[in-house]
């Protein structure tokens, strides 16, 4: 496999995906903007269920490409930056059933582009209730916020849901820890920089139930443990098979 550019995970093939060792969830990330329609959701679910049970080892995880979850193209512009710290957000919208996760990302992106006029969805990586990881905005560009802090230098992770109202599933914490561990090793960022949105601006984000895992040190410990075990190899999963994986998520598989 060719060495990826710094800050951009390598692309994983279907064969490599099936060979990844692991535990729960699958994941997401950056690709093209055209969405490929899967032909057989049930087949996709069968094909990926075995992989799901093996994906999330201490060293390997998948990122579902933008085309897989149906992202629009990013607009031109944005602020280039160098990532120096890590910040946790929640969606502040009840997710409920995880089948809603990809559609929420599409809704968030439309809102951010059409209502706020931003170049793209505000965050760099998203994590759903089942620990699937989605790449959102390019990590080369600073995120956006409707609050009063400067996002330059921040690696922004979005946990889907409203954690003032919803509990935080274990799988979602695992996915968030993996995303942050990947960022820490890729951008050489200390885990001591990890913060919640509310630490930087006047907001309840990332919600009381999720913030509890920050304030207690639980999330940082999870990230540190992953790094001590060798870090996280976050690999991009793109094309028809990735689109089929998203269709399976939306079908409840």
Where are these regions (language model features)?
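Active-site acidic/histidine clusters and adjacent loop/turn architecture
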Residues: 80-115
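Short Gly/Pro-enriched turn/cap motifs at secondary-structure boundaries
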Residues: 115-116, 146-148
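Short, small/polar residue-rich loop motifs at catalytic or cofactor-binding pockets
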Residues: 120
């Amino acid at each position: 496999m060719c060495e990826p550019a710094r800050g951009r995970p390598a692309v994983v093939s279907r064969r490599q995906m099936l060979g990844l060792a692991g535990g729960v969830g699958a994941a997401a990330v950056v690709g093209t903007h055209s969405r490929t329609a899967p032909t057989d959701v049930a087949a996709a679910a069968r094909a990926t269920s075995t992989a799901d049970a093996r994906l999330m080892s201490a060293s390997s995880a998948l990122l579902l490409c933008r085309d897989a979850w149906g992202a629009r193209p990013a607009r031109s512009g944005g602020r280039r930056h160098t990532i120096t710290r890590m910040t946790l957000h929640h969606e502040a919208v009840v997710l409920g059933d995880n089948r809603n996760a990809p559609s929420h990302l599409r809704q968030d992106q439309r809102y951010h582009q059409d209502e706020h006029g931003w170049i793209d969805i505000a965050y760099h990586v998203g994590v759903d209730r089942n620990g699937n990881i989605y790449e959102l905005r390019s990590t080369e560009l600073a995120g956006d916020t409707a609050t009063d802090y400067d996002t330059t230098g921040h690696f922004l992770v979005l946990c889907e849901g409203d954690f003032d109202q919803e509990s935080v599933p274990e799988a979602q914490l695992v996915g968030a820890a993996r995303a942050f561990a990947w960022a820490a090793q890729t951008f050489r960022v200390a885990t001591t920089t990890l913060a919640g949105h509310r630490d930087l601006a006047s907001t309840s984000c990332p919600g009381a139930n999720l913030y509890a895992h920050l304030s207690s040190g639980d999330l940082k410990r999870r990230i540190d443990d992953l790094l001590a075990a060798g870090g996280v190899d976050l690999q991009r999963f793109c094309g028809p098979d990735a689109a089929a994986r998203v269709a399976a998520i939306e079908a409840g598989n």
